[in-house]
Amino acid sequence: SEKCIRDRHTLENDITVINDAYNASPTSMRAAIDTLGTLTGRRILILGDVLELGENSKEMHIGVGNYLEEKHIDVLYTFGNEAKYIYDSGQQHVEKAQHFNSKDDMIEVLTSDLKAHDRVLVKGSRGMKLEEVVNALIS
């Protein structure tokens, strides 16, 4: 989507960070997964909660995790109470997965693990403030 292109940062060593941290729905998360899956390099997906889903929240987050099947995502990092459900259902579909209770912990693991040619996509509801993760990577 145009949003992805507009918020695409290229770092040294051909590392790409796509910031899509301003809004999220289960549908737009699936679209983001599709986008990331088309890129070459190691694909790292960072997802936070989709807020305001009401009583369907758990089931919808589980659905996003299930959607990762055969989407060629290498690494899944999640943050947030609801995103834990994405981790639970999605971890079997990726090479490596980890759920974080703190953004600082996630940033630490991510920055220490980042390699040349990695493709990182960050997405979550605005209230999750996942742009903090993006800013840590691109600063």
Identify the meaning behind each predicted range.
Residues R8-S139:
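ATP-dependent carboxylate-amine ligase
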